[in-house]
From Swiss-Prot:
Lineage of producing organism: Bacteria, Pseudomonadati, Campylobacterota, Epsilonproteobacteria, Campylobacterales
Record has Nucleotide-binding as a keyword: yes
Subunit note: Homodimer.
GO cellular component, one term: cytosol
Identification of the protein by name: Proline--tRNA ligase
Organism: Campylobacter jejuni subsp. jejuni serotype O:23/36 (strain 81-176)
Amino acid sequence: MMRFTKFYAPSLKEAPKDASLPSHIFLTRAGFVEQIGSGLYNFLPLGKRVLDKIKNIVKEEMDKAGAQEVNLSFITPASLWQESGRYNVFGKELLRFKDRKKNEFVLGPTHEEAMLSLVKNKITSYKQLPLHLYQIGLKFRDEARPRFGLLRCREFLMKDGYSFHANEEDLGREFELMYKTYSQILQRMGLDFRAVEADSGAIGGSGSKEFMVLAKNGEDDILICENCDYAANVEAAKRAKKTCQDERPEANYASKFHTPNIKTIDSLAQFFKINAFYTIKAVVKKAIYENESKLVVFFIRGSDDLQEIKAQNACSALELVDASEEELEKAGLVAGFIGFVGLKDIDFYIDFELENEKQMIMGANEKDYHLIGIDVVNLNKDRFKDLIEVKEGDCCVKCGAKLKQSKGIEVGHIFKLGQKYSKAMNANFLDENGKSQPFYMGCYGIGVSRLLAVAIEANHDEKGCIWNKTLAPFVLEIIVSNLKDEKALEFANKLYEDLTNLGLEVLLDDRNERFGVKMNDFELMGFPYALVIGKGLENNEIELIQREDLVKELIKTDELMEILKKKVL
């Protein structure tokens, strides 16, 4: 019997001072969650009910796909992370600690190493493959600035799965299966999402897709083609190669021109009266590695911008930071006049789209001079990388239509890890020829607690949460407008019992509060429907309110059950 007088849902009149996003404001105010520290949250009964529904959907679909559930320790020996090589790569977000015996451990943000250790030396033959194990449990990332409530916290509930395969083809099959499984999970939750091309980040691997729920407060920029199914995170987006109809600058190869104080692309284009499309921009960054740092130069078209994650991946750095003027001078680089012709002792990369371009303009590596007539040919193929930031209005790499930029929130990520971890940790099996081979691995994560917040980011109004029937903690709230009205209270109790017996999740608001307070709480908590039992009962009428648009409908009591079965059940 779920009556409001017995239900623990402490609501707040004011939002937390650090709350800026609707999900953070409403979930805290409505009593779904309670913050107990920086990036740390308790889930109260309302939040736990939603969390359980999300977990059940995830579990049902994963089990249907043939994955098997396990439950690994929250704590992982640091030696496993050292063995895989990720101990230092992951950075400060990985919480490291020692026990009383000085043994080193980590709180796992992901469990590739732990899961590989689980199957290592136990799965020994190709006959035991493929295998897919998953868990739904707590993870921890020591975020520098936890914010946005459940969207960027330190402790979170996540489903992480790991698959093991005898060959790359079978890994590809499982990757496609998980693509369909994740799509089904999010469809069942009623969320508007896109599966997008993505960067693999610290987890690594040969390919990955992110699952993004569209929301105007999304933290990620994504590019979507509305003509085909192409979608990508801006960090990984590609485009059809750009062209320009304006005239190219004409000059002999690598002619040197005096360009006094012409340090920017705009001033360079104006100086030569050309489109910036025909210029080459140099962006200098300091690349941070595990044991060293060095300057790296990235050359892109003057009309484009550098995408820093792409640049970081191109040079395999842990991080890229801006280079100072002193560092440039020490390396012999002249800011505003850098080019790759004659560039010595410095790593450099060139954007793919510049390969085989002709009659370009770029710096001459000499103050106040540029080179005209540069042909980007006969260079080492390894220097050419995808470096540019794709933008709205660029053309789709698949069909050529215009790309549109949207905001999204990442809720899931699937990876083809290949043999990266199995080789590092010497985890092998015997193939059908009796030869020892490293496993091919995939990993698949979905943010369970994050989905709770994402559902509200995608569905809310100025009054509060708007839950759909699939995720709502209660599908229907019965509100008695006046507890002194004994007939109304008796009718509400009987209706509550009848609906509960039908399997409907109902909350009976039997509090001795003003009607306005009850309505405000209904709108804040966001249950899909409310039945208001008040004076209309004298005329055998009850008011049904739909939370999504707050439309009200008077229903005759003798038609009530039939209408509820159609709309609510």
